[in-house]
Amino acid sequence: MVKVNVIFHSIHGHTYKMAEAIAEGAREVEGAEVEIYQVPETLPYEVLEKMGAIETKNLFAHIPVVTRSMYEDVFAGADALIFGTPTRYGNMTAQMRTVFDGLGGLWSRDALVGKVGSVFTSSGTQHGGQESTILTTHVTLLHLGMIIVGLPYSETRQRRMDEITGGSPYGASTIAGAEENRQPSENELAMARYQGRHVTQIAKKLIG
């Protein structure tokens, strides 16, 4: 059995939909046990309400929120960890950063060394920092000792030129639009499924 956990942060639901697609692809691998978690939201209700995010947050309210008491099971207990975060100025969101910053105890005893790590993202525009967000998140994964897996060009959908689409060798991504009203396309969701499957296959090989 290979255990894969998908951990995401989402406000308007785009990263959540990609997370579901990632998990769907991971579950296609025989013997895979896949769970999805969301990180705690740090924005107050009033701010989320002004952002028009209450309704969209409710769409994935059923997804468990990963708390510090769960870090051992969710992080140290997995063979592969796939992280999803929207872009914030070319980096992960503060909500996701807070979770990573809380992993010091696991880091200090090398609990994540040798585990497979992968990242996916979303942004408001085509050039909204998708690649830099994934790459800067990779830096954190490297400090934790993880083995990074991206989205290889064998997933040919990232080569498409006939439509606006996310996706790069660094990981799957989606473009939400400036008003957050564009939903992940089938092409983007297919790349997310590929990434989930690819990461899980590699993790399965590594654990023998």
UniProtKB/Swiss-Prot annotation:
Origin superkingdom: Archaea
Enzyme Commission code(s) on record: 1.6.5.2
Recorded GO CC terms: membrane
PROSITE patterns membership: FLAVODOXIN_LIKE
Cofactor annotation comment: Binds 1 FMN per monomer.
Residues engaged in binding FMN: 10-15, 87-89, 122-128, 143
Flavodoxin-like domain sequence ranges: 4-199
Catalysed reactions, as listed in the record: a quinone + NADH + H(+) = a quinol + NAD(+); a quinone + NADPH + H(+) = a quinol + NADP(+)
NCBIfam families: flav_wrbA (TIGR01755), PRK03767.1 (NF002999)
Name listed for the protein in its UniProt record: NAD(P)H dehydrogenase (quinone)
